[in-house]
Structure formats: C-alpha cells, structure tokens
C-alpha cells in the first residue's frame, strides 16, 4: 500500500504525504505500546468491539523504531509482518490491509484491485483539511484526509451496494504515533436508514 520509495516529496500528493510518508513516530520514545479500540457496526452484518496493539522498540542506535502489531483478536486476528525500521505509523497499513481483505470477502473482488483503487484515489482524489479532535479530554489540532475510492470506479456495478464507501484518516502530531483514528462508512440506500457498515479505529493511549 505504501507508495514506492526513492521519489522526491513533490512526486506525491498532499494526502499521500500525510498518510504514508510523514514521520508519524517522531513523537514516540521507545519502548512504547500504542493501544487502539476497534468497532464494527451497521445493518449489513453483525458488529463487534475489539482492540489493536502496536509495540515499538528502539533500533540498535537507539532511534525509533522496530514494531510489532496485534490487529484484532481470536478468529478475526490479522497476521502481520514485523516492521524493522518504521517511520510512518504501521496502524495505517494494518487497517487498510484488514479493510481490503474485508472488501474481498464481501464482494469476491481481487484484493489487488481494491489496493489499486485506494492508491489512485489517495494520489489524485483525496481531500486534506485542517481539523481539531478530542484526545484524553483536550482539544488537539490536526488534519483529516478523506476520500471515496470506488465512487467513480467504472466497475462499481459489480459491488454497487458498497461503492459509496468513505475513508477518513484523523491525523495529529499531538497524539502518540500521529494517528488519532481511522473511520470507514458505507451509507444506506436511503438517508433516513442507519449506515450499512461502519468501522472505527481510535487511539486510547500510549504506555512505556
């Protein structure tokens, strides 16, 4: 999911830089653990509450960070590779990998197709806007990146019910690891009906 390395910053959109390339772990002092809540809800199928844990350890020179992740639990747990030299927060890639596998499960469409749609939209169709969030009782400044990767997909007829899916990334340097949360939402066919599907990951805090 991460754009290819070796390109200058100007080759990437503002959304790509905010989501994939920013040094989101700059405010983290390893060893540290980031804790996130995860909630799935909606009328499409049963929901659940779970958690996500990311553990960070210092590199040999003391800098940040090598990381290990636990994304959800039990039969929902996502097998994740360790990351040897993380700069951006791995929780973003983990969430997107979970999301892509869910899109495949719900539609039987190829995972690589959904990856490509997300990459293309973050590059050329995402919105980045200033935002403020609440974190541990305080208001913090940040940015919200939002996009709908399937809205103008010529193949959307194959999964029309899910084609309006919206992604929102809540980013703030005032939050450990730089990512306050990620939300996805698929609205129902009528405005007065509850959403078809929502998923929300929110940071709970950091511990040494």
Regions found by a protein language model. Give the residues of each.
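Acidic, serine/threonine-rich low-complexity disordered tracts
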Residues: 2-83, 107-208
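Surface-exposed, glycine/proline- and aromatic-rich loop segments on solvent-exposed faces
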Residues: 77-102
């Amino acid at each position: 999911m991460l754009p290819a390395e070796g390109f200058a910053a100007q080759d990437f959109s503002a959304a790509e830089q905010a989501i994939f390339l920013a040094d989101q772990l700059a405010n983290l002092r390893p060893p540290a653990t980031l804790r996130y809540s995860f909630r799935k809800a909606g009328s499409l199928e049963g929901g659940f509450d779970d958690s996500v844990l990311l553990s960070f350890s210092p590199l040999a020179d003391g800098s940040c960070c090598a990381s290990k992740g636990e994304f959800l639990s039990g039969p929902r747990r996502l097998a994740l590779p360790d990351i040897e030299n993380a700069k951006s927060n791995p929780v973003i890639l983990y969430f997107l990998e979970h999301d892509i596998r869910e899109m495949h499960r719900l539609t039987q469409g190829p995972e690589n197709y959904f990856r490509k749609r997300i990459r293309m939209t973050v590059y050329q169709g995402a919105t980045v806007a200033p935002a403020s969030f609440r974190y541990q009782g305080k208001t913090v400044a940040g940015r919200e990146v939002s996009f709908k990767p399937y809205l103008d997909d010529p193949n959307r007829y194959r999964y029309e019910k899910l084609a309006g899916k919206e992604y929102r990334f809540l980013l703030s340097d005032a939050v450990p690891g730089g990512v306050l949360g990620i939300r996805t939402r698929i609205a129902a066919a009528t405005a007065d009906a509850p959403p078809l599907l929502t998923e929300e990951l929110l940071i709970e805090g950091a511990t040494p």
